[in-house]
Amino acid sequence: MDQLYLEIEISTQKETTIYTGVSSFLALFTYKFLKDPKNVRVNFVSTKIEGGKIALRSSQLKKELTDRHITCRDAASLPAIQDLKLPIYEKDGNTFIAGTCAVCRELIARQPNEELKKLLGFKGSCLLAPSEASIWTKFCEVDLVAVVSKLHSGQVLEFVPQEVVRFEQHMNEPVRMHNIYKQAREQANQTENGGKVKRRERVQIKCTTPKEELLIEHRFAEGISFTIADIILYPLLRIVFQHCGQMLPHFPLTSTWFSEIDSFGDKCARVLRDLYVPQAIKTPPGELGIPDCEATSLYKADPKRYKPRNRIYTSQLELEAALSKLSSLQLQFNSDSEHTYGQQLIDWEQIEPTHAKSSALPKERLERKRQQLENLANAVVSLAQPGDRIVDFCSGTGHLAILLALKLPNCTIIVMENKAFSLLQAQKRSNELGLTNCVFYQCNIDYFVGGFKIGASLHACGTATDIVLQQCRRAKAHFVCCPCCYGSLQPMPHISYPLSKAFQKVLDTKDYLYIAHSADQAHEMGTTNCKPETTLQGLHCMSVVDTDRLLQAEEAGYQVILTRLKPEQCTPKNHLLVGRFVKQN
């Protein structure tokens, strides 16, 4: 049986009020929407909830709220409960999923009823992309959740939250869906009683017709079909509007959306009524202000979300000016090192005798991939001790993690990846090899809060490498990282550039991004369109960025080696950072 872990906090005063976090509330809401599926057992994890707390109607939870189903997080025997942010979905005994949308999707996907699986949208892709990669998933899983959390922390609104305005604008956008022209033709050729018009009288709609001119409007959050996005957004927006006084009439499309869901079936409203205890609301007199909000799409693929005027275009003069500022640091920017990790070759035929035949990679590319893996595996082995927990961040289909599991049978290897399909492939290969020391976490890096001894990542894209290094510093864990996509570095709420105190003294963020941009000009010598002088400049910029990473780690108490993979031709992005935590600053 699958397990669903939700966080609760029981008040100490007479223990009558039961609270949960916003994300766990959404998972419980989905579970109740599915009518308490019999193949999933709910487990409540007693913890101190951070952020806003939602009071639950405990009368609806009598069946689940027994001592047998309540675990204390600090004393949990299951490591995943301490490793991941709640809610967590467990399946197959060694796979754990964190993240609101991913957990709610899995609740639906694991149901035998095929009709329910239609809630996952076309090809099961609704909210499939992780929040790091999808603005739409981030809106549902992060942005609106943060709004509700603040409201339940006592925030009094002066303005309608910007997220409400963004959703109203989203509902005014043209519908994006598969076969939209087919749907438009069917809609245009239906009679009032639902029948079809005669063939010669049919309205013709060409595929060259702009989508804005098609008479298809949003009924639901993702178009004309009720999906998991509606299940997640409905309780969030209902709660927000409870704190907005009489502001709903100012948002007619959102109001119509509420009505559509309520008329589609009262299940959402009923589940919300059964679970949610409204809090006492303090609203200022009069109407709330409505913030101005630029009309940008909530879909990543929509060209309206790209703002070319805001992008950084690096000129040679700006790059040279940024690099010249570093001269005062009197540092050597290079990756030359006496330490290398490519000498110990691995007998791949012994480890995975059939993988070369089944791999989709061409022979030469497979060889280069294996050389990359050898370097990282050897570096991790040089740091590992029996019993260590080792995390392969951004694991993809698990090539590095599986190699580590084979070479270090006395260590636990955590395979962490936010894409469900990739993690499924990793699990399949692990099962084929009979590995018993792998645990699989489907989640964003930020949802991992557990302890570990070594963190590794091979070509984690852009800022993801710096999030991995941040996780290692948090856990005081050794690290082995081969960075990638330097040009994709972007500041985030918890990551700012430059990283090290030394670089911060001489560079601002814009200077730093000029250098990072140029680091992506490093191509393999002799390849098409490769200018030697540009490639050498790109290699120098790679060394600058990775020296900044090295200095930041040294400031946190690490001994760090910056070297290159061997042979160096195995990848253009061949830098390797190996850090050993030695002291607490």
UniProtKB/Swiss-Prot annotation:
User: What's the short name of a Pfam family annotated to this entry?
Assistant: Methyltransf_32
Q: Where is the GST C-terminal domain?
A: 120-275
A single GO cellular-component term from the record reads: cytoplasm
Q: List the disulfide bonds.
A: none
Q: Which InterPro entries match?
A: Glutathione-S-Trfase_C_sf, Methyltranfer_dom, SAM-dependent_MTases_sf
Q: Which domain of life is it from?
A: Eukaryota
By sequence similarity, the record places it as follows: Belongs to the GSTCD family.
What name appears for this protein in its UniProt entry?
A: Glutathione S-transferase C-terminal domain-containing protein homolog
Origin species, per record, is: Drosophila melanogaster (Fruit fly)
